[in-house]
Amino acid sequence: MQPEKLVRMANQIAAFFKAQGQASAPAEIADHLIKFWDPRMRKDILAHVDAGGAGLDPLARQAMELLPRKD
């Protein structure tokens, strides 16, 4: 999947949890990605993060650090 689309999706998820005002938002975002994203999508977004993570919301970027690196 194109990194731009994954970034947009991750940022939408981050915006939802940010609006909830939860201190645990990064963990909640990571949990959502683990539950609902295909492992290939997680692999692709992590590759994007490793390449600099352009366009990612800071909250989404924090969540990416919590994702397992192997599925």
Regions found by a protein language model. Give the residues of each.
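N-terminal acidic leader/helix
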Residues: 1-23
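Short, charged early-sequence alpha-helical segments and their helix-coil boundaries
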Residues: 41-67
